[in-house]
């Protein structure tokens, strides 16, 4: 997924009209990685988390057909796409934190069935299944809450620290990588 890197602003700036939220308190300029909030993030996503200095941007605008509500798993017959259905996906400039889940289709049932069919013969599946199944049984209101809950479980199981969260949109700056 897209990764924007930039040095964080220093805390205590006297410019009260700045359109950014101060996220870190570092003495010197360091690079931070701004990540989208992803559904069942990829291995690449976790490599960024392991490097540290990551911020998940909850204020970014929702992008249709992206990792925010799509994931890919390896099924017995190849790669399978999983899509979390959301309401009003076409609303322009909608922050990810405001995107609501749509339960008119049985996507949770389909996703859990695909995960079980693909991984039930894997070692320790029964141990891990208990941590993930609630995400496919309970109805969540917001995509961000759903994805954050999954990310917390994944990070906990993998021993990876949770990233910082920014609830304010982080504007791209000149020199950012995208």
List PLM regions with ranges:
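Intrinsic-disorder/low-complexity regions
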Residues: 14, 24, 175-177
């Amino acid at each position: 997924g897209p990764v924007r890197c930039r040095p964080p602003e220093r805390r205590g700036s006297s410019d009260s009209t700045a359109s950014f939220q101060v996220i870190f308190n570092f003495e010197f300029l360091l690079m931070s990685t701004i990540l989208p909030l992803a559904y069942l993030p990829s291995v690449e996503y976790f490599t960024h988390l392991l490097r540290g200095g990551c911020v998940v941007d909850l204020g970014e605008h929702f992008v249709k057909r992206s990792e925010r509500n799509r994931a890919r798993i390896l099924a017995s017959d190849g790669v399978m796409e999983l899509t979390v259905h959301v309401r009003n996906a076409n609303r322009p400039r909608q922050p990810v934190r405001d995107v609501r889940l749509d339960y008119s289709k049985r996507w949770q049932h389909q996703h859990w069935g695909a995960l079980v069919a693909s991984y039930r013969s894997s070692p320790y599946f029964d141990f891990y299944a208990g941590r993930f199944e609630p995400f496919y049984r309970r109805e969540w209101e917001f995509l961000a809450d759903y994805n954050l809950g999954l990310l917390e479980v994944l990070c906990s199981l993998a021993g990876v620290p949770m990233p910082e969260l920014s609830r304010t949109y982080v504007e791209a700056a000149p020199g950012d990588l995208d």
